[in-house]
Amino acid sequence: MIKENFIKLYENSFRENWDLPCYTDYGENTQYTYGQVAEEIARLHLLFKHCSLRRGDKISVIGKNNAHWCIAYMATITYGAIIVPILQDFSPNDVHHIVNHSESTFLFTSDNIWDNLEEEKLTGLRGVFSLTDFRCLYQRDGETIQKFLKNLDKEMHSSYPQGFSRENIQYTTLSNDKVMLLNYTSGTTGFSKGVMLTGNNLAGNVTFGIPVSYTHLRAHETDSYL
């Protein structure tokens, strides 16, 4: 059992490092501070709340590594849902299988990957979102996702009339023994198999790396990290 709560580790990190750089897309000028990432997470949380997502609901993400991939991942876990990361080099059939087998409600995807998927084979999805700008690429009949996203700025102002600040970061309370991630590996036979990872698994990796990172950072303060 890891002493530090996985979700609270990130909640505290966003607060303490509010003005520092958090994510940068390689080869681009796009950069997010910890505070900006926390605000993007808050926007996605409002969407999840609007759609009545609950603890244990699954959200898949597939695409190249970028800031929005990380934001979708963090927004899912800090809301209390379960993230399902999918390798971007999986075939469309494998992606269809993983999304359906995991019973994912939402899918965040690169536009080019979505172009090669067949929405009629993803019967459980309520919404699909672009990792380029989080716009809605698909909503199931009867959903109001696209309409909500058009008014998201107003929803943010209504929820945070004084503006979003570090004091507004209050993520769900979830013990480390709960499943937070379904990891599908490339199967040697048939379709890929899913592995359930808990907060303890994830917190163990994070807490192990923190002392090593701090030691290196003190010696190399101007370095960037992948």
Language-model features: locations:
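A short N-terminal helical cap/helix-turn-helix that marks the beginning
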Residues: 1-22
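Flexible, low-complexity linker/hinge segments
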Residues: 1-5, 137-179
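Conserved AMP-binding/adenylate-forming core of the ANL superfamily
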Residues: 2, 22-66, 70-74, 91-96, ...
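Conserved AMP-binding A3 loop
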Residues: 33-35, 171-172, 180-206, 226
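Conserved structural elements of the adenylate-forming
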Residues: 38-44, 176, 195-218
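Hydrophobic alpha-helical segments in the ANL/AMP-binding
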Residues: 49, 67-86, 95-96, 207-210, ...
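Structural core segment of the AMP-binding/adenylate-forming
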Residues: 51, 78-157
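Conserved small/polar residues in nucleotide/adenosyl-binding loops
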Residues: 185, 215-222
